[in-house]
């Protein structure tokens, strides 16, 4: 609130509040936050899944996210070329957020035995959705604001995307920890009823569970699998939580207005006018 009041009074505000009167600026800012949350939800949770459930090292988990980046890069290039050729951009964030929502729901099917090729397909699809959306909304934003506001508007969009990633990471992390505790308690309780002797030999404190994940041979196989199932189920809930967020992004994309793309001549005229105002 203090920031908004201060910006309203400032002669040269960091983020002019009048920009929020621009329909496209407001929508793309919200879309940026949604995409940031979706991006970091995938980027953070997938490596955790690979390290914990699939027993990959941090380096291997990072390398196995290359398909995600391939999806982002390839679809960013594709959408950029299509926009340049046809001058239409609205359909890309609509398609992109729809693909992201479907792909994140597909991630809820991951199990302990899911092969890497299947995960790669899911990652490519998530990346494709991000690639179709992420840069397209920046184009829509830059096309909708005045030339002299383009820099601050673009920076603001990046800020809101970062803000979305921060809140997304916090929300998804909280959901993961909450559901993990629930599934761990439930899984080990069921195991105790089936075989009390097994449970008496293990440490189910947080430190003990961390050790059992890192050193699977230190505990009976059934105990280790119970812990992995708890993690897998917790990841499912995280992805189920992320899907409505990206679905909300789809609704926002539908509301985006498609304005005629500016030409290089338009920008040249705007620069001349801005230079004239500065001299005057």
Language-model region placement:
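Hydrophobic transmembrane architecture of multi-pass small-molecule transporters
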Residues: 140, 161-257, 263, 269-280
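Structural signal for alpha-helical transmembrane segments and their membrane-water exit/capping regions
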Residues: 1-10, 175-179
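Transmembrane core module of solute transporters
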Residues: 4-152, 242, 260-263, 277
């Amino acid at each position: 609130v203090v920031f908004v009041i201060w910006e309203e009074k400032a002669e040269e505000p960091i983020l002019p509040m009048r920009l929020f009167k621009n329909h496209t600026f407001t929508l793309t800012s919200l879309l940026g936050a949604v995409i940031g949350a979706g991006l970091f939800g995938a980027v953070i949770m997938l490596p955790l899944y690979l390290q914990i459930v699939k027993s990959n090292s941090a380096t291997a988990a990072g390398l196995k996210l290359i398909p995600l980046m391939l999806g982002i890069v390839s679809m960013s290039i594709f959408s950029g070329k299509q926009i340049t050729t046809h001058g239409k951009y609205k359909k890309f964030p609509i398609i992109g957020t729809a693909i992201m929502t479907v792909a994140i729901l597909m991630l809820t099917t991951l199990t302990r035995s899911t092969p890497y090729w299947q995960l790669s397909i899911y990652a490519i699809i998530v990346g494709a959705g991000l690639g179709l959306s992420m840069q397209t909304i920046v184009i829509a934003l830059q096309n909708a604001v005045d030339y002299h506001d383009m820099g601050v508007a673009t920076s603001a969009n990046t800020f809101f995307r970062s803000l979305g990633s921060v809140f997304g990471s916090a929300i998804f992390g909280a959901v993961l920890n909450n559901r993990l505790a629930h599934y761990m308690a439930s899984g080990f309780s069921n195991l105790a009823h089936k075989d009390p002797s097994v449970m008496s030999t293990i440490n189910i404190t947080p430190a003990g569970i961390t050790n059992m994940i890192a050193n699977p041979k230190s505990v009976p196989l059934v105990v280790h699998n119970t812990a992995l199932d708890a993690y897998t189920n917790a990841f499912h809930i995280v992805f189920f939580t992320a899907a409505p967020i990206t679905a909300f992004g789809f609704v926002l994309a539908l509301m985006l207005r498609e304005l005629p793309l500016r030409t290089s001549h338009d920008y040249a005229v705007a620069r001349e006018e801005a230079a004239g105002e500065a001299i005057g």
